[in-house]
């Protein structure tokens, strides 16, 4: 339903829904006459997006995405609306990649491609038609900040290995880069949109000094194969002064739920 704050009138939107379908997200666009309404079937493997007119209540379908398994929840946060376009991420190519649509629902182009995943769309710079995003192109254990220009040239902006995230200014000219890795607590820098570090905001040097006084076990990455031949990543922490000739009790932790990657090159205790 929509509610007109001036007329005090409530209107029911004409959203096509399966008997067991539901609406997981409703988003404002930059057009007051287009309300983005996203629906899923109960199996959660078919997503439809409609633009609804709050006054007429008519809803027009502008996008459908389907999966053999399920639609990841992260797709919702990567839909960003601009005056003439919107972004969308999908696994329809086999990997999670970024797509660029017109507000009429026409696919303009697939922005990214390759055997890696786009983890987050950061934004679009209208001045030079550049896209900014985070992906795990280097390793499934790491994430870096990238830019793709109007000609499709890709540039890696983050310089430190590990897990990088970024928050851009409204005009897409600056961003805060937050990163850590297995041996480095969180560091936050202010960068321009070429990746140049303008200022270091957080170093966590005091924390590193404090930790140096203690014998803290370090994580070690390893890989193993499942019974059906799939390679998986893991990490282990051995006791301080570990001896391979001794036996130790083992605490094993494993969780395979969606959106829950546990093995990452990031700092934690």
Predicted segments with their positions:
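Beta-propeller folds
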Residues: 1-174, 180-186, 190-193, 216
């Amino acid at each position: 339903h929509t509610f007109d704050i001036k007329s005090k009138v409530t209107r029911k939107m004409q959203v096509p829904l399966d008997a067991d379908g539901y609406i997981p997200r409703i988003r404002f666009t930059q057009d007051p006459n287009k309300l983005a309404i996203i629906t899923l079937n109960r199996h959660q493997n078919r997503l439809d997006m409609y633009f609804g007119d709050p006054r007429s209540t008519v809803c027009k379908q502008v996008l459908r995405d389907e999966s053999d398994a399920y639609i990841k929840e992260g797709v919702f946060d990567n839909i960003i609306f601009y005056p003439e376009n919107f972004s969308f991420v999908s696994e329809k190519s086999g990997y999670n990649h970024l797509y660029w649509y017109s507000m009429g629902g026409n696919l303009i182009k697939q922005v990214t491609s390759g055997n890696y995943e786009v983890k987050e769309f950061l934004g679009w710079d209208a001045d030079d038609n550049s896209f900014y995003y985070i992906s795990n192109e280097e390793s499934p254990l790491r994430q870096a900040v990238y830019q793709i220009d109007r000609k499709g040239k890709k540039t890696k902006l983050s310089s430190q290995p590990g897990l990088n995230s970024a928050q851009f200014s409204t005009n897409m000219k600056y961003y805060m880069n937050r990163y850590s890795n297995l041996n480095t607590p969180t560091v936050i820098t202010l960068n321009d949109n070429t990746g140049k570090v303008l200022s270091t905001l957080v170093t966590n040097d005091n924390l590193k000094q404090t930790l140096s006084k203690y014998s803290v076990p370090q994580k070690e990455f390893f890989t193993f194969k499942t019974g059906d031949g799939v390679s998986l990543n893991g990490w282990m922490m051995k006791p301080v002064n570990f001896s391979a000739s001794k036996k130790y009790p083992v605490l094993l932790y494993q969780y395979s739920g969606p959106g829950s990657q546990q093995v990452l090159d990031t700092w934690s205790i």
